Amino acid sequence: MIQMQSKLDVADNTGARSVMCIKVLGGSKRRYASIGDIIKVTVKDAAPRGRVKKGDVYNAVVVRTAKGVRRPDGSLVKFDNNAAVLLNNKLEPIGTRIFGPVTRELRSERFMKIVSLAPEVL
């Protein structure tokens, strides 16, 4: 469950290390985002020669949450951290590599590129 002011790690090679959620997209009263949801983030920590710099605002998709996601068979998939992948205005990933596992819930028409770049799909 990601809400405004939540800090997330970045799971791609854009150069951003951590981001902060500034808005959960999808309705004016929407409070929480989970895996597969799009959020608006600002870069809080960035590598010196990365593609993004501190203070930039981007869209991002949540790929891992500590809260986890419940599957129809009753199993629960949790992670140690909250992580996101930065997106451009066309909702395509900015980075060319994804670090760490992602969940099968991202296998929609929108995020197949992220699933194909990920080293492991749970």
UniProtKB/Swiss-Prot annotation:
Keyword set, alphabetical order: Ribonucleoprotein, Ribosomal protein, RNA-binding, rRNA-binding
Top-rank lineage group of the source organism: Bacteria
A GO molecular function held by the record: large ribosomal subunit rRNA binding
PROSITE patterns: RIBOSOMAL_L14 (PS00049)
Pfam families tied to this protein: Ribosomal_L14 (PF00238)
Record InterPro entries: Ribosomal_uL14, Ribosomal_uL14_bac-type, Ribosomal_uL14_CS, Ribosomal_uL14_sf
GO CC terms of this entry: cytosolic large ribosomal subunit
One GO biological process term: translation
Protein function: Binds to 23S rRNA. Forms part of two intersubunit bridges in the 70S ribosome.
Record-stated family: Belongs to the universal ribosomal protein uL14 family.
Subunit description: Part of the 50S ribosomal subunit. Forms a cluster with proteins L3 and L19. In the 70S ribosome, L14 and L19 interact and together make contacts with the 16S rRNA in bridges B5 and B8.
PANTHER family cross-referenced by the UniProt entry: 50S/60S RIBOSOMAL PROTEIN L14/L23 (PTHR11761), LARGE RIBOSOMAL SUBUNIT PROTEIN UL14M (PTHR11761:SF3)
This protein's name: Large ribosomal subunit protein uL14
Gene source species: Azoarcus sp. (strain BH72)
Lineage: Bacteria, Pseudomonadati, Pseudomonadota, Betaproteobacteria, Rhodocyclales
